Amino acid sequence: MQHIRNFSIIAHIDHGKSTLADRLIHRCGGLAEREMSAQVLDSMDIERERGITIKAQTASLQYKSQDGTVYNLNLIDTPGHVDFSYEVSRSLSACEGALLVVDASQGVEAQTVANCYTAIELGVEVLPVLNKMDLPQADPEAARQEVEDVIGIDASEAVLASAKTGMGIDEILESIVARVPPPKGDPSAPLQALIIDSWFDNYVGVVMLVRIVNGVLKPKDKILLMASHATHLCEQIGVFTPKSQPRPELSAGEVGFVIAGIKELEHAKVGDTITLAGKPAAEPLPGFKEVKPQVFAGLYPVESSEYDQLRDSLEKLKLNDAALMFEPEVSQALGFGFRCGFLGLLHMEIVQERLEREFDMDIITTAPSVVYEVEQRDGTVVTIESPSRMPEIAKIADIREPIVKVTLFMPQEYVGPVMTLCNNKRGVQLNMSYHGRQVHLTYEIPLAEIVLDFFDKLKSVSRGYASMDYEFVEYRSADVVKVDLLINGDRVDALAMIAHRNNARYRAREVVSRMRGLIPRQMFDVAIQAAIGAEVIARENVKALRKNVLAKCYGGDISRKKKLLEKQKAGKKRMKQVGSVEIPQEAFLAILQVEDK
């Protein structure tokens, strides 16, 4: 065990984490030259294209250090994005060390800080690495200063490296061996293994990536998963060098994979503890929590005949993504579809993109909403994921909305516009500090304001320089109301929205006027109204198309004209009673694009 080192890499998007991982694998001879593809550990196409890492992956590398000892280095790759922060904390708790990769030309960014604090809380040894030293604009001194100011760790021994040219790779490996402590653990104690990640393989079922904390695991052992109380027979174990290689056993301190013929990903939850069914551990490893979706949206197939196909696609995605939740939902306007829960906006985009790309689905997504807690007058508390499920106003005692703490980093010239944006989004400023040329702002903002378009707006007011990170704080009472949309007096459930009372009238007017341009003219007048309860707060009319019935009367008597006009009017009235209005799909998207003032 003295020769094992478990470490992971922490970095903001695009600071060169995956490239560095490739270099380390290459240097330790994990893959032959011909098998090296860029970003070996990012296995999904979408991970490579967006340049982000979604699932954790591992590589066990054999490294012969300068004094001749062979060390077994386990690299655990972590996702860097805020939506996947739980996966990050699980990956980090399986390590004793972490490389903090900072782009020497850009300095520290928000997500790096968030993940770095997670690492420090878990007691992981953090080694700073200044990457991209081959760039002409690299400024190692400023970056070093920022690491010390913002994160507060000593960066005087930071390794200067460039993953692209391969400079500094040996120094990184040596500092891992020298500064990362070996794992603690007792091979003779009852088995405790942490599930770092799990995914579904078409041939063998669920593959679990585990870190053995205590004990030894061998094939043919009966294992027990402590959170889901499921027992399975362990079929195959091994390590990834990124290719999988079977092993006769995994003992304390090692990282590897376990295949136990599990059919459902629900059983192998990330963060759960594996132990032996015959000789179980006294208690599970700390830190496990159920991941709860924060953002909900409806997904509907464009062709209603593709409903079953959408369900199959979602089930297949769920095999690889335990955080995705979905349940069937029927909307009068959009037909049959699903209400899906996501960890955050990026997660939602990725699910949509994977549905379109891997399963060839055409889908409509309704406006994303967050989960509200509603306390009713009889004292019961219900959670509302969709505006159409909001109880009647008379029954509601209090509505609580989720509040998140947002950490923002940006160059000082953009502080003004960013603060204005946060205030418009009902933000409350908690803190502001300057570190060199970077400014660090902390705000509390309702999650509902963030899911709409906060991220896009932030990027546009700061010309792309600001970076953000958010974490859930609590539910707080809020003055929010449900705004219904009525078309010819009929409520359209899919168009209902929940808005803050101060903002409701403005948003209602915007949506209604936008809908007016999208609903085609009919043979009769169409009234589009927005209402809070019974009070109508905005209205637009779509004028009827009419034929000029007087065209054939030359001169003629006024009573003759009147008769024709009355006849037309009666016809229109009759039509309005039986006619129904087709709502085009663009109208549903209109709600998504309404700006808050």
UniProtKB/Swiss-Prot annotation:
EC numbers for this chain: 3.6.5.n1
Name its cellular compartments: Cell inner membrane
At the top of the EC hierarchy, this enzyme's class is: hydrolase
The protein's matches in SMART domains, at most eight in alphabetical order, are given as: EFG_C
Offer one Pfam family short name for this entry.
EFG_C
Q: What is this protein called?
A: Elongation factor 4
- What organism does the record attribute this protein to? Bordetella parapertussis (strain 12822 / ATCC BAA-587 / NCTC 13253)
The UniProt record gives the binding positions of GTP as: 14-19, 131-134
Instruction: Provide the alphabetized UniProt keywords.
Output: Cell inner membrane, Cell membrane, GTP-binding, Hydrolase, Membrane, Nucleotide-binding, Protein biosynthesis
Per the similarity annotation, which family is this?
Answer: Belongs to the TRAFAC class translation factor GTPase superfamily. Classic translation factor GTPase family. LepA subfamily.
